[in-house]
Amino acid sequence: MVSELEALLGPGVVSARTDDLLAHSYDVWPVATKWRQQGKQPFRPDAVVRPASVEQVSRVLAWASRERIPVTPWGLGSSVTGAPLPTHGGVVVDMSSMRRVLAVDETNLLVRAEAGKLGIELERELGARGYTLGHSPQSLDRSSVGGWVGTRAAGQFSSRYGNIEDLVVALTLVTPTGEQVRTPMVPRAAIGPDLKQLFIGAEGALGIVTDVTLKIFPLPEHRRLETVRFRRVEDGVGAMREIMRVGLRPFLVRFYDADESRHAVGDPAFAGCAMFLGVEGVRAVAEAEFKVAVTICKAHGGGPLGPAAAEAWMDRRFDFSTVENLLAKPGGLAETIEVAHFWDHILRTYRALKGALAPYAAEVLGHFSHVYPQGTSLYLILLGEVADDATAEARLGKIWEAAMSVALEHGAAISHHHGVGVVRLPYIARALGSGAAVLGQVKAALDPAGISNPGKLGLPMGLDGLRTAQGGDSYV
């Protein structure tokens, strides 16, 4: 396999070094962290390739389809669900060498970047020109443009700027059979279905994204932040709903339950539930929005506390150390689970999830963010310690079984922005319903050999005859 790839791609692109294979056997999914710490390697690629051009990606996929070799795309490995793990061995296509900014269009407010571009680098380069992506996931300093598209990501400022599906204007993709596809480069079109949306969230199962054109925005001239205390979860959720209902567009609206508020505010004695609220843009408009938003919060029993806690959160918003440090301990247990629902169901879903998950962790923290006129996401963080890493791995499985059962019973989206990966595979067929068969037909048409991230999204794998020299015991 390696010699075939080297003949196809030339020197310096293909690796079968043990350290490279090991590095591409784990992402930052907590279960994968526990595997690593126990010396387990359920998934291992046979080779890693680092293409430098769309032509090289095309050659790899055409060859893999012809030879029936599994291919798994890899951005920067920051997935928390197992999405980039090579569950059937084969070739990992690491996109990190394709990291150029191809164009910045200041007239039409667009940037075109290759899929391996690190998010925070792109944001800084745009900031130097006076622009922002408006897309700011917690993983901005460790995730790639292609990874955002593959997982259907959302940033912390999505309530103003939109999620990744709202920000992508066009993309280039190589199908599993090696064809290059470029979606129309227009602000909008009515020429049939919007094909780019088919690939946003596909987690590499329908091909590999090689570059993306995104919207950009002028840096705001003015920003206001506030921390608001509410007595009850119901009060803060009601304020969020009304803020969105009347048409305000805060860039930041995060509401924490009492358990997470103590962490978010940084005060173990904090009583109540905290909201971080932020508006930005043209000064006059931002000030008007701020006044209305605070008035709404007060009408729902909220008490403004000043901007300090919200400002401190802005400074540390990419910090993932609480979860990472706990997972690094033998027996340390940490997990994040995000779902979404309509306003009339979100509180029942929240209470049911908190109750179902309480037996499995010392702390179950909850917050609401990524807010829409119709509903909101709900993000849960579980923290605890058990006897050892094997027990932690088993406990994580129980946590997901409990969380997904509750989400499905309540009709919630089983993921808002982390994606499916490996961890949600047992639940996706039920979540998609009759749409699963349609997606399977699309997969069969684009990937007749079944080689592109096989098994992900619960799609037919077409594993008969797939070549793989390695790969560990299957987890899926």
Feature map (PLM): residue ranges:
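Activity-critical C-terminal alpha-helical subdomain
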Residues: E179, R424-V476
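Residue-level signal for inorganic ion chemistry
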Residues: L5, A64, G116, G178, ...
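N-terminal flexible segment immediately upstream of the FAD-binding catalytic core
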Residues: M1-A62, S79-L109, A258-D267, A309-E335, ...
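FAD-binding subdomain of flavoenzyme oxidoreductases
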Residues: R100-R254, A469-V476
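C-terminal substrate-recognition/cap domain of FAD-linked oxidoreductases
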Residues: S15-K34, P218, R224, R229, ...
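Conserved, mostly hydrophobic/aromatic
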Residues: A64, G204, D447
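Alpha-helix capping/hinge segments and adjacent helical runs
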Residues: G10-V14, L408-G419, G433, A444-P454
